């Protein structure tokens, strides 16, 4: 009888405790799922920010003018008698060919045209250019912590982005009185970017790759005005000041949505590629050119100010639309170089240029300004340029720019065809 009562008591106790144990297990599972969801959300937001920073760097670097390619300015304006005296005083030197009142050789005419951006070969000139840039970057995302010399606890993803950019430029220039010049530049941009990620399913050996292309579209159109305020002499260089305004006519990068690639929750790619910065900018600059027989030295300095702009949507998350403001970082750019005339038709140049950019800021509606980490840049380039004068009116100008800092494109190759009317 006693044993029967004890058995009944145990059964009753078990029946009463079981619901509480099941409820405790359910609450534990819910907390674990919430924790996992929070980690996934933080990882997704980190990748969104990383992609935005990389996209801003690509657009920021590709939007900059290439390293100056030396070609010919206009001849310094002097009275004929003074020009003849100068020529007699320095007869037989390379500098004399720039001072001579007679027409210089085509290669001398092409020596530093792009160095100052001032074209004096005719009243009107039209230039067509084609440029190809390649840019790649690798960024490591760690979710967890590093222990015991490279043993990773948590998820790991290695993301690499390869960007190929083709730009077709059409530039028209009008030179007035050998002192003033106005120009307009309209680019058409084609882009293709390939995104790679390792770490799918927690494995570092599985790599997912996804390519995104953007159809050829209009980029940011720019307008410029230049004034030649100083003529070259024995002690002074040719000097030109310029002012350029860029309009946001291209596809801006803000509000482009990210989508997850099937089979790899580490990889999110944009559904479109921009062709412009999306903001107005203004760039004052100065260029100097000086003959130092037998070479020509040139240099330039400019500063770009980006205006603050408002957008209806700056959120990259699918199904979410958030308005806000964007303030791209301003930047300085400087360049120096040397050029030589090889013969009457051909010249060659070597140059270095650097772009230093401040950090960008974003502000969602109802929130405060936030600095975008990693959006500053220091892009350095080494440039090789050549000019070949087909005739007095038509030239071919190929150039190669090699990136020497991580923020610069790996390389940029371009060729321009200026024609003078």
From Swiss-Prot:
Protein family (similarity comment): Belongs to the amyloid transporter (TC 9.B.153) family.
Keyword flag Iron: no
Coiled coil: 23-64
Organism: Pseudomonas aeruginosa (strain ATCC 15692 / DSM 22644 / CIP 104116 / JCM 14847 / LMG 12228 / 1C / PRS 101 / PAO1)
Localization: Secreted; Cell surface; Cell outer membrane
Function: Transports fibril components across the outer membrane. Upon overexpression of the endogenous six-gene locus (fapA-fapF), cells form large clumps during liquid growth, make large amounts of biofilm and produce amyloid fibrils.
Protein known as: Functional amyloid transporter FapF
Keywords for the protein's UniProt record, in alphabetical order: Cell outer membrane, Coiled coil, Membrane, Protein transport, Secreted, Signal, Transport
Pfam families assigned: Phenol_MetA_deg
């Amino acid at each position: 009888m006693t044993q029967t009562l004890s058995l009944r008591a145990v059964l009753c106790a078990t029946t009463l405790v079981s619901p509480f144990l099941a409820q405790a297990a359910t609450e534990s599972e819910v907390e674990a799922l919430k924790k996992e969801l929070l980690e996934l959300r933080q990882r997704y937001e980190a990748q969104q920010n990383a992609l935005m920073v990389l996209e801003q760097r690509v657009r920021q670097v590709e939007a900059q003018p290439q390293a100056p390619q030396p070609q010919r300015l206009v001849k310094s304006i002097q009275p004929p008698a003074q020009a003849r005296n100068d020529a007699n005083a320095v007869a037989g030197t390379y500098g004399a060919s720039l001072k001579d009142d007679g027409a210089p050789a085509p290669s001398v005419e092409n020596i530093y045209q792009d160095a100052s951006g001032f074209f004096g070969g005719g009243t009107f000139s039209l230039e067509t250019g084609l440029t190809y840039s390649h840019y790649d970057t690798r960024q490591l995302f760690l979710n967890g912590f590093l222990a015991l010399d490279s043993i990773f606890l948590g998820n790991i993803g290695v993301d690499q982005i390869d960007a190929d950019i083709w730009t077709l430029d059409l530039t028209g220039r009008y030179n007035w009185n050998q002192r003033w010049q106005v120009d307009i530049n309209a680019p058409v941009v084609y882009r293709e970017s390939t995104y790679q990620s390792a770490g799918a399913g927690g494995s570092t050996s599985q790599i997912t790759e996804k390519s995104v292309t953007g159809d050829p579209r209009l980029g940011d159109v720019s307008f410029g005005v230049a004034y030649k305020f100083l003529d070259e002499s024995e002690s002074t260089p040719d000097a030109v000041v310029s002012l350029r305004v860029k309009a946001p006519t291209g596809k801006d990068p803000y509000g482009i949505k990210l989508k997850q690639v099937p089979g790899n929750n580490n990889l999110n790619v944009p559904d479109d590629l921009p062709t412009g910065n999306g903001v107005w900018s203004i760039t004052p600059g100065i260029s100097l050119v000086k003959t130092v027989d037998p070479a020509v030295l040139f240099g330039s300095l400019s500063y770009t100010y980006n205006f603050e702009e408002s957008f209806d949507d700056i959120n990259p998350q699918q199904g979410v639309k958030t308005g806000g403001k964007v303030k791209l970082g301003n930047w300085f750019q400087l360049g120096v170089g040397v050029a030589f005339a090889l013969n009457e038709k051909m010249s060659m140049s070597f140059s270095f240029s650097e772009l230093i950019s401040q950090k960008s800021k974003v502000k969602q509606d109802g929130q405060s300004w936030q600095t975008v980490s990693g959006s500053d840049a220091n892009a350095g380039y080494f440039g090789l340029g050549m000019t070949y004068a087909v005739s007095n009116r038509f030239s071919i100008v190929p150039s190669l720019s090699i990136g020497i800092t991580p923020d610069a494109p790996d390389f940029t190759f371009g060729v321009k065809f200026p024609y003078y009317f």
